[in-house]
Every structure is written in structure tokens, then in C-alpha cells.
């Protein structure tokens, strides 16, 4: 299942959540702390601490800190986006 590493108030994360909802995709939300220093789980996964970060464990894909690329990826691999 897709995992979205995010913070609640990040506008780029809100955009990705909207796209995932538009596509009707199930995903796991991994809420990260506001402080980059405290994002140890995200750092261990991707080597960086920026959100949004999408992890697709089934395909071995991690897309970090790029809402456009995340939306493009899920649209291409999981269906078309409803605008």
C-alpha cells in the first residue's frame, strides 16, 4: 500500500492528498513532526527530511519533496486523475 509522509498543514501535502482522493486510492498517512531534526523515520527511509514524500513499497519507489512528480506517478501507475 502507498505511504504518504507528510505534515497536516503543508500545502503541497494537501495537494497530494487531494489527488490521491480524486483517484480513490487507499494509502497510509505517515505524519511527520514539524521539525526536520525530528523526522528520523523519513530520513531513514529516503535519506532526506522534506515532505511530501511518497513511498510505494510494492514497486520500490520513493519520490521525495515533489508534489507534481508524486501526482504524475500515481496517475500514471494507479489510474487517471479526475480534475
Where are these regions (language model features)?
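GST-like domain detector, emphasizing the conserved glutathione-binding G-site
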Residues: 1-9, 14-83
Amino acid at each position: 500500500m502507498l505511504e504518504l509522509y507528510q505534515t497536516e498543514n503543508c500545502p503541497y501535502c494537501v495537494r497530494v492528498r487531494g489527488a490521491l482522493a480524486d483517484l480513490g486510492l487507499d494509502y497510509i498517512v505517515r505524519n511527520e513532526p514539524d521539525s526536520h531534526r525530528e523526522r528520523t523515520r523519513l530520513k531513514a527511509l529516503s535519506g532526506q527530511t522534506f515532505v511530501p514524500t511518497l513511498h510505494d513499497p510494492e514497486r520500490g519507489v520513493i519520490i521525495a519533496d515533489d508534489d507534481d512528480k508524486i501526482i504524475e506517478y500515481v496517475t500514471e501507475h494507479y489510474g487517471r486523475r479526475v480534475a
